[in-house]
Amino acid sequence: MFKYPLAVTIDTNIFDAAKFDLCDTSPLKTLENYVKNGKIKVVLSDIVVRESKRHIADQVKKICGIMRKARATALEESTEHLIRTIGLGEILRIVTNKDELISKGEEMFDDFLRTINTEILGADLIDVGLVLGDYFETKPPFENSEKKKSEFPDAFIAQQIRKRFGETEEVVIISNDKGFIRACGESENHLFFSSLGKLYNAI
């Protein structure tokens, strides 16, 4: 049985899977409800926050590209006049404020993190020497030689979690990244779920 509030940390791939959706029926909105009810305390690495914002920016850029292509396709098939006349003029809009749109997406995420009273783990919890030791000894998450260098963020996040929670304080880690899970998995006080939904089912 869990002790509440349950400390929960979430990997970037979980936010990606949720597509940063904050509608009333989304897993992230459900997380907010669990926080408000005192069941969950969210603790995130500053690396996860930064990666998530970068992924939001990437999503905004993709959406702008899709809109640009949709505009071009519509104008190949019809005219501006007809498109506006039938009430679909929004598709003709040219996006000129991409940076502003990215900022809005990032602000939405920041507001969400504030709403759920997120504790952010900083770089002060990272011992670069220990991470480099793991890198050269090919310990998790560095065991795959082809992807070794791209695993540094996971190694830093795993170390932040270990330093923050020690060997006794229970923490739930939500991730579907096997290398990251192996990097975190040395402590008995770490509980793993591959999705927010699976955690909710267990609460």
Q: Which stretches of residues belong to each language-model region?
A:
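Active-site-proximal, substrate-binding regions of enzyme catalytic domains
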Residues: 2-170, 178-203
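Conserved nucleotidyltransferase catalytic core and NTase-mimicking acidic/glycine-rich helix/loop elements
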Residues: 173
